[in-house]
Each structure stands twice: as C-alpha cells, then as structure tokens.
Regions:
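Extracellular "leader-to-stem" segments immediately downstream of a signal peptide or signal-anchor
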Residues: 2-82, 87-100, 104-216
Length: 216
C-alpha cells in the first residue's frame, strides 16, 4: 500500500502530471510506450498544509488539517494543496473539485495505524466498510502530483506468510502483537498491542481492507 508519486491519479479525462514541475523525464526510455496524461485545469491558488496546523512529525494526526485546507481551497474554487517535506500522519482525505494534492520531495502522507479512523460516519453512524485513504466521488479536475510518497501503512492491514519473510521480519511482526493461524504459517494484524480490532475475526477484518486511492 505504498506508492511513490511521479505522475499519479486524476479524474474523469484528467489524469495529471504537473504543478510547477516537468514530469516528461519519467516517460523517457521506458520499456513500453506510455502517453503522458492530460493536465487537469487547476486554479492558480495554493495553500500549505502547515497553514492549517499540520505537524509533519509522523506522530501528530493531521486529518483535521487536511479537511480545513481542502475546505479553504473549495471556497476559493480550487487550487493546490502543498504537502511539504515531512511525515504527515492522517486519516481519511476527501478531495473536491479543482484541487491538486501536491507532495513535495521527501513528503510522506502516512495512513494512521488506528484502523477505526478509516471509516466515514454520517449522523453519528459509522459505515460498515473502511474508506480509501484518499477519495473523491462525482468530482472533476482532481490531481495528485509531486515526488513524495503516499504510504497506506499496510503492516497493520495485511496478513503475512511466514515463508515470505526473514526471521528478523517475522519477529518484528509478532512484536506488534497480532494473531498466528494455520499452524503458525500465517500472521494477521489482529489483536495488535496498541490498536483495536474493527471486526470479530482476523479473516473478517482482512475483508475490510480497502484501496489506497479511489476516485469515482
């Protein structure tokens, strides 16, 4: 669930490439032919995530800061949300029309390991399934650009086969807590030491794992 952003997602006909950068170099000398995506039309207005109280220490939850920044951009008709260098721990990010989420080099958007933060709520009622870390529904002119990283924190979501990891890695997983099944051949991030479950069984919890990014 980790993805380096060189040229990533956009919406409708607007798969995007650029905000103050030339991504053409990433299309040179490829083993297969790829067309560069069509640029989204983003207003010439920008805000920095830190303007809304975000702290890039990898520990502070910045969900509210993302919400405030996107709300500000939406009021202005859109623009660029600059995510500077740092590790920006967050829950769900919901993009709106005409917004470019731009990750500068060495910027990491890190999904919170608290899985309870990955549900949307309406009128105080929580959805039955987790939502993608970054999403948008029925929106237009959305782009995600830059040379940063979006890290979905997959270690707290996906099961691990004993045969696929080293002894050191296996020990590290089990130090998180978790549950072994299949005679110790499979580890699930269920009953972790520091984070609660979101289902009654390891298998049911695994079925709730969702996409990193979804634009519909």
């Amino acid at each position: 669930m980790k993805k380096t952003l060189m040229v990533v997602v956009a919406m409708l006909t607007s798969l995007t490439a650029a905000f103050a950068n030339d991504y053409g170099k990433y299309y040179q000398n490829l083993p297969v032919k790829m067309e560069q995506p069509v640029l989204a039309t983003i207003p010439d207005y920008s805000v920095n995530l830190t303007d809304f109280g975000a702290v890039g220490d990898g520990l502070t939850l910045n969900t509210e800061a993302f919400e405030k920044a996107i709300k500000d951009l939406d009021k202005k008709g859109g623009g660029h949300l600059i995510v500077p260098q740092g590790i920006w721990l967050t829950g769900l990010i919901s993009l709106k029309d005409n917004i470019d989420l731009h990750l500068e080099k060495n910027a990491i958007i890190l999904a919170t390991p608290d899985r309870t933060q990955h549900f949307k709520t309406k009128d105080g009622v929580r959805d039955k399934k987790c939502s993608p870390l970054i999403s948008a529904s029925k929106r237009k002119n959305i782009s995600i650009t830059g040379e940063g990283i979006i890290d979905g924190n997959g270690a707290v979501w996906r099961p691990v086969k004993r045969s696929k990891v080293s002894d050191v890695e296996w020990k590290q997983y089990n130090e998180m807590g978790g549950t072994q099944t299949d005679g110790g051949k499979l580890w699930f991030p269920f009953n972790l030491k520091h984070f609660g479950n979101i289902a009654d069984t390891p298998q049911a919890q695994e079925s709730l794992r969702t996409h990193l990014i979804r634009l519909t």
